[in-house]
Amino acid sequence: MSPSTTTIFIGPILAVDAAVSHAIHTAAKPFLPPFVLLLLEISADFRFSFPVSLSFLLSPPLRSFLVPFLLGLLFDLIFVGIVKLIFRRARPAYNHPSMSAAVSADHYSFPSGHASRVFFVAASVHFFSAAAEASMTGPSYSFLDGWIRDHNDGDVKVEVVVVVWIWATVTAISRILLGRHYVLDVAAGAFLGIVEALFALRFLRFDEMIFGR
């Protein structure tokens, strides 16, 4: 497909996406709680989420989840960066870097790295909970285990899964409200995050190799 043909098909879609995204941002701007939205931005930043997740390795029963999870976070960072370099879609013109709590590592908009990351986290927790790994049915080793585990069946507590999904959804929407991304950027990022979670939990399970039994 030639560049001109691509423009004919993609151009109108991007134009509608930009118009809808700007309308949402403009309508919501007077009511936005900047402090809360910036906290959401920080919570989903890789430089915050990765070290925090890394510290959870102190809980042995969680390692079967955390090893593919941490590798998945790294994969997400690299893969989304490559996709951004391929598409090179500029961020919205009304995006104000001065309002950002996190220093942006790039100037490209598609897909949203924050959206992919938070949906990767939410999907990973959800899928791991549904799988009910055998290693999670053992005795609790720390306060952390008791906080997130349901000792009736060893699974991750439903409340934790629900809270993580709510956090992911609100954070993803905040990217549009803050003017960081367009709607399609966030939708694509969310989709990639879920696919990456499936990939990580299936193909990046090296916990036995790293920690042994």
Curated annotation (Swiss-Prot):
It is found in: Membrane. It is an enzyme of class 3 (hydrolase). Its EC number is 3.1.3.-. Keywords: Hydrolase, Membrane, Transmembrane, Transmembrane helix. One of its GO terms (cellular component) is membrane. The chain crosses the membrane at residues 30-50, 67-87, 118-138, 158-178, 181-201. SMART domains: acidPPc. It is a multi-pass membrane protein. GO terms for molecular function: hydrolase activity. The keyword Transmembrane applies. It comes from the Eukaryota. Pfam families: PAP2. Belongs to the PA-phosphatase related phosphoesterase family. This is Probable lipid phosphate phosphatase beta. The gene is LPPB.
